[in-house]
Design a protein with these regions (language model features):
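Hydrophobic anchor at the beta1->P-loop junction of P-loop NTPases
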Residues: 6
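Pre-Walker A (Motif I) flank of P-loop NTPase domains
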Residues: 1-3
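Conserved phosphate-donor/acceptor-positioning beta-strand/loop module used by diverse small-molecule
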Residues: 94-114
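Conserved substrate/cofactor phosphate-moiety recognition/catalytic segment
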Residues: 18-61
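Conserved lysine of the Walker
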Residues: 14
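Small-molecule kinase domains that catalyze NTP-dependent phosphoryl transfer to phosphate-bearing small molecules
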Residues: 116-158
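Glycine-rich phosphate-binding loop used to anchor ATP phosphates in small-molecule kinases
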Residues: 51-94
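Walker A (P-loop) phosphate-binding loop of P-loop NTPases
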Residues: 11
Length: 166
């Protein structure tokens, strides 16, 4: 099974890009890692992140058993390298074919996208500052793609290359 991982700061466009890829490729499941640790109030600590990784891998394992599912797109903010490593190790154990990409954009683009996404409960000024502060860390990742001047479909094409199923 093919698994596409989209990492990056909040507001960069992981969800919209992941959903676009899933919709354009029949037999693709979409997983938002946030669903896998949706505890109220939100707690992002070692224990809840480990639980989320376990939930993600369990879901992917189940999709792998389904003859209708050919690919999974996972979107999740993984700023802790050990979390990403745990996901990648788990996918290796599942013998998945993995492409991991970190989406980034410049500061002005992130602010614009943030302000245009009013439907998300996380789009507060406090979280925007946290997201902006994380840009340099994500930009330093070797798999980073700068989406500042790219549309969603251009970003998806860059991620998928010749792997698109449609």
């Amino acid at each position: 099974m093919r698994v596409i991982i989209l990492n990056g700061p909040m507001g960069v466009g992981k969800t919209v890009t992941g959903k676009f890829i899933a919709e354009k490729n029949p037999g693709t499941a979409f997983i938002d890692g946030d669903w896998c640790m949706d505890i109220h109030p939100f707690v992002g600590n070692r224990e809840t992140k480990a639980m989320a990784v376990d939930n993600i891998l369990h879901m992917i394992g189940n999709y792998q058993k389904c003859s209708e599912c050919k690919m999974v797109v996972l979107v999740w903010l993984m700023d802790d390298p050990s979390v990403l490593r745990s996901v990648l190790d788990g996918l290796a154990a599942l013998r998945a074919e993995v492409k991991s990409v970190t989406l980034i954009c410049d500061r002005d683009t992130l602010i614009r996208r943030w302000k245009n996404d009013r439907g998300c409960e996380w789009r507060t000024d406090q979280w925007l500052e946290i997201s902006l502060a994380s840009l340099p860390r994500f930009a330093s990742m070797k798999d980073a793609i700068d989406t500042s001047v790219l549309s969603v479909d251009q970003t998806a094409d860059m991620i998928m290359g010749d792997q698109s199923q449609s």
